[in-house]
Amino acid sequence: MKKIIICFIFVFSINVSFADATSELIDKIKNIHSMTANFNQKLIDGQTNNNLNSKGNMSLKKPQYFKWITTSPNNQEIVSNGTKLWIYDGDLDQLIIKKVSNDIAQFPYLILLSKNTNNINKLFTVTAQDNNSYILKPKNDQMIDSIKIKFTPNNQLEYLEISTSLNQFTKIEFNNVKTDVDISNTSFDFKAPQNTDIIDETKSA
């Protein structure tokens, strides 16, 4: 009987720990109402041993606005106004327009824009490494192995780490972070440059 009680206490304490970590992470994400930052991104491909470094800037405004602009080594922009998602490749002069989806596997940083942060509990098992670092393990997603979110002591986003099932590792470090800034909604509408090849998937059946 003692063993059963001890096992129950152990399992219960683990569940409480997961719940506390999830609640802490949700509180931190909820406190990000708007944000601008520069980023440095490093992609390590374990299959080819190739590394790719890129940098740029991003901005978000809850509940639906998002912009991710890569300025080096190539010009790429991902912009969403909550209804449409524009993916622009400046080198190819190509723009793909999609309907917005909450595909965290494709864009892991969308977790920061989640309209219902309680969904984090449904999608991930969350553990806290310390007061400012959290590991998210997807419950169903087969593309992502884990996401690590690190905050600074004053609760600003410091970096994201994403590991995938394809043996790829991405680390995105943020700097010059500003939160609760006033950002115009119209800045999240994308206007294609002249002579851009446009593929509008929102018009497909």
UniProtKB/Swiss-Prot annotation:
UniProt superkingdom? Bacteria
GO CC entries: outer membrane-bounded periplasmic space
Q: What is its main location?
A: periplasm
UniProt keyword list: Chaperone, Periplasm, Protein transport, Signal, Transport
Its GO biological process terms?
A: lipoprotein localization to outer membrane; lipoprotein transport
Question: Does the UniProt entry include the keyword Protein transport?
Answer: yes
Keyword Cytoplasm part of the UniProt annotation: no
- What protein family does this chain belong to? Belongs to the LolA family.
Q: Which HAMAP family does the entry link to?
A: LolA
Q: Which NCBIfam families match?
A: lolA
| Complexes and interactors | Monomer.
Q: Could you identify this protein by its name?
A: Outer-membrane lipoprotein carrier protein
